[in-house]
A protein has these predicted regions:
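Signature of soluble extracytoplasmic/periplasmic domains of secreted precursors
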Residues: 1-206
């Protein structure tokens, strides 16, 4: 799978962790990657899926299913078990399964089919951050050119005990009751071998 991604995807990568309507299910996770040639990338992915060794308890018919929306049916590919999704996103998932589909000229990867369908539905309904007031307010102080950017509700991050929270510096954990009231925007720009951080905290009531 890593070789497939190296040959078919570009340098633009977006990792999303968002709440489902049923909070008992835990957050949904999706990795979105730019693709150089969608038709060729999908042809190669289909071949990869069809020629992969069969897993115990699964048949070939379950390797390709569909995500149905009011306007289109998207093929969903069940990939061989791998830790690559966790390596690329740092999202610790209980399953090694990865599901893939193509949407809007991009390759979407997720640990479950439900995450993919919810992500596509949000995009179809134009439920994106670009138009959100909190997003615009937080990015006003950031550069238009960057190599990495993170936006996260600090309260949600601190609730991910055993998952993403181990990446949070100890200072924020010690003062978690204070920082859970903020939205975190972190941006990193690389120039001449130097990494320049830019961090903005926005109070949620604003």
């Amino acid at each position: 799978l890593s070789r497939y991604l190296a040959e078919n995807t570009g340098q633009d990568l977006v990792a999303c962790l968002f709440q489902r309507e049923d909070s008992l299910m835990g957050p949904a996770a999706v990795l979105s990657l730019s693709v150089m040639d969608v038709a060729e990338a999908e042809r190669m992915l289909r071949s990869l899926v069809n020629t992969a060794p069969a897993e115990e308890g699964t048949g070939r018919n379950s390797r390709i299913t569909f995500c149905y929306t009011p306007s289109k049916a998207y093929p969903v590919y069940r990939l061989p078990q791998t830790t690559l999704f966790t390596q690329l996103t740092s999202f610790v998932e209980p399953s090694l399964h990865v599901f893939a589909t193509f949407y809007g000229g991009r390759l979407l990867l997720a640990p479950d089919e439900d995450s993919l369908s919810r992500y596509i539905r949000h995009l179809d309904n134009d439920e994106v951050l670009d138009g959100a007031l909190a997003y615009r307010a937080g990015t006003d102080g950031l550069s238009d050119s960057y190599h990495f950017m993170l936006m996260a509700d600090f309260g949600h991050v601190l609730e991910q005990s055993g998952h993403q929270v181990h990446y949070v510096p100890e200072f924020f954990l010690r003062n978690s009751e204070f920082f859970r009231n903020f939205i975190l925007f972190a941006q990193f720009t690389c120039a001449d071998g130097v990494v320049y951080p830019n961090i903005v905290l926005k109070y949620k009531s604003e």
